[in-house]
Curated annotation (Swiss-Prot):
GO cellular component: mitochondrial inner membrane
Biological process terms in GO annotation: lipid homeostasis; mitochondrion organization; phospholipid homeostasis
Transit peptide, UniProt annotation: 1-33
Chief place of localization: mitochondrion
Keywords assigned: Membrane, Mitochondrion, Mitochondrion inner membrane, Transit peptide, Transmembrane, Transmembrane helix
Record protein name field: ABC1 family protein MCP2 homolog
Membrane-protein topology: Single-pass membrane protein
Mitochondrial intermembrane-facing ranges: 57-557
Residue intervals annotated with topology Mitochondrial matrix: 34-39
InterPro entries named among the record's database cross-references: ABC1_dom (IPR004147), ADCK1_dom (IPR045307), Kinase-like_dom_sf (IPR011009), Mito_struct-func_regulator (IPR051130)
Length: 557
């Protein structure tokens, strides 16, 4: 995902440290006197100029030219896409297959046209493209497959600009903050990049996340242009169902651009899991500013690095089980504080270090805590009840909770059941939990969906669902995807059975809280509480036994 690049040689701020050979730049220990500077206060109607508060050398004329060019690219590409879609959708075709082929070709042309604009504009446009690439459950595959290319095409910020950003945001340059700073980034993403460094007068190595300076400068205009494009699409195509995406981007981007929020999320997650027996490890936060985050440096391999696990005798099946526990705890645990982007690049695996509390011979390291969602307690309980009724297939109750959680009508219920389980609705009673177990079965199922037009129906349904519900479903899907990437032997059933136990606990805790807060006599509370407790223990034991059965069946039989 991340790209590497060559850095320019900088001699103004630092020099090589003579006593130690290193790939890092070592700074002189002589303190420097710096003149005081002030951040320019830009107040006015222009939201674009508001972003320039972080730049001392802001040039309004130059910025106006750059902004105009960026906006022109978006407007031109938008106009060409509108024209293309209008022509294709307004034409007559001999058959539905011919129409679908023409529409597919149009999707591909417009996606490639947009890709070029995203690459040229950079910044949040690359972030938008990356979001689109992960939305195969809502938008056509021609778009998602095209946007995947943006995962490893993120431009980097020069060391000179990073030093300047440090001076603006902290009053100190890199040489006053670190003894060593690796000029080669550990990773470069659309909004920021990460470097390894050693703290001043210390042996402590840290990871330094630095926001690209151009992002805060251009993001107000970019967000406005994004909303304009979506509104224009809605005007030309009233049936367009993705206006929510513009709302989601406007909501999430400010959170991702504020690294103090990321630090807060990281600390809260670390504290939440501190009392649990888990292999999860969250790096310690040293300090943060809105555009700078300094945290503990943790070396590890990507979670999908199978050779690393095999070399270190790490069980892929146990890793998959632990990941499932971690994210179900986030969804159904107290507080409902959910990490929204658990893809392979944000989850590392490392051998268990000394003094670790992990019950395994490894730790799972969770990174990038910039985007979280707080799940309301009522939604937690309803979502838990929905999944329990899916697993036990109580159709009446399932329809009730599907309507509460996802606003799904009885008419669309079969489509919803297919979307959330990955299996035909009619087979829910007979097939084992987890859906098709073999790649060939999955291909046949997807092919049948496409031929029957069910895939388009699923996409339309998902685009109308509440955003938070869709996010929960996406997280469940990402956990299943990580399990597939690990190529586990224990089968997909375990993921659902583990989730079932968290759902049980969530529903049980809610019942007990409601009971003790009710005005019933204490004797009635004791009897009801005992009944709830026994029911919970029995059901939990049932799912645990089923989980162990499927585990040993796939592993040893």
């Amino acid at each position: 995902m991340f790209s590497r690049f060559s850095w320019p040689r900088i001699t103004r701020c630092f020099r090589s440290y003579p006593k130690k050979k290193s790939s890092c730049i070592s700074f002189t220990h002589h303190a420097r006197e710096h003149t005081n500077f002030k951040k320019p206060a830009v107040v006015g109607a222009s939201i674009t100029l508001m972003a320039s508060v972080a730049l001392v050398d802001f040039d309004p004329v130059k910025h106006a030219g750059v902004s105009s060019k960026r906006a022109y690219r978006v407007v031109l590409a938008g106009f060409l896409c509108f024209s293309d879609y209008k022509k294709v959708l307004g034409s007559s075709y001999a058959s539905e297959e011919e129409r679908q082929l023409a529409l597919s070709e149009c999707h591909l042309r417009c996606a490639e046209r947009s890709l070029k604009v995203f690459e040229e504009n950079g910044g949040i446009y690359i972030k938008i493209g990356q979001h689109l690439s992960a939305m195969g459950y809502v938008i056509p595959k021609e778009w998602t497959n095209t946007m995947v290319k943006l995962q490893d095409r993120c431009p980097s910020t020069s060391l000179k600009d990073i030093d300047h950003l440090f001076r603006v945001d902290t009053g100190k340059g890199l040489d006053e903050t670190f003894d060593e700073f690796d000029p080669i980034a550990l990773g470069v993403a659309s909004l920021a990049q990460v470097h390894k460094a050693r703290l001043k007068d210390s042996d402590v190595w840290v990871a330094v996340k630095v926001q690209h300076p151009s992002v805060s400068l251009n993001s107000p205009l970019d967000l406005s242009m994004t909303r304009w494009v979506f509104k224009a699409i809605k005007t030309f195509f009233p049936d367009f169902k993705l206006m929510w995406l513009a709302d989601e981007i406007e909501r999430s981007l400010p959170q991702e651009l504020d690294f103090t929020r990321e630090a807060k999320n990281s600390i809260e997650t670390k504290e939440h899991f501190a009392h649990l027996s888990t292999s999860l490890y969250v790096p310690e936060v040293m300090w943060s500013k809105p555009r700078i985050l300094v945290m503990e440096y943790v070396a590890g391999a990507r979670i999908d690095n199978l050779s690393f696990m095999d070399e270190h005798s790490i069980s892929r099946d146990l890793v998959s089980v632990d990941i499932c526990h971690i994210f179900n705890e986030m969804i159904f645990g107290k507080g409902g504080h959910l990490h929204c982007d658990p893809h392979g690049g944000n989850v590392l695996i490392r051998s268990k270090p000394k003094n670790s509390k992990s019950p395994r011979n490894y730790e799972i390291v969770l990174l990038d805590h910039g985007l979280y969602r707080d799940i309301p307690h009522e939604l937690q309980v309803d979502y838990a009840n929905m999944w329990l009724n899916i697993i036990n297939f109580n159709e009446k109750n399932l329809k009730f909770y599907a309507k509460k959680v996802a606003n799904v009508s009885d008419e669309n219920f079969p489509i919803f059941a297919t979307a959330i389980t990955g299996r035909p609705y009619k087979s829910l009673k007979s097939l084992p939990i987890g859906g098709p177990n073999h790649e060939e079965e999955q291909k046949k199922f997807i092919s049948a969906l496409q031929k029957g037009g069910m895939l388009q129906s699923i996409i339309r349904l998902l685009s109308t669902m509440p955003r938070l519900t869709l996010l929960l479903m996406k997280t469940n899907d990402l956990v299943r995807s990580l399990d597939e990437n690990l190529k586990t032997k224990s089968g997909p059933e375990k993921l659902y059975l583990i989730m079932a136990r968290y759902c049980l606990r969530c529903v049980y805790d809610d019942k007990m809280d409601s009971l003790w807060n009710s005005r019933s006599f204490w004797v009635s509370k004791v009897f009801k509480g005992t009944y709830y407790r026994l029911s919970y223990l029995f059901s939990s034991l049932k799912y645990t036994l089923a989980e162990n059965y499927f585990y040993y069946k796939h592993m040893y039989l």
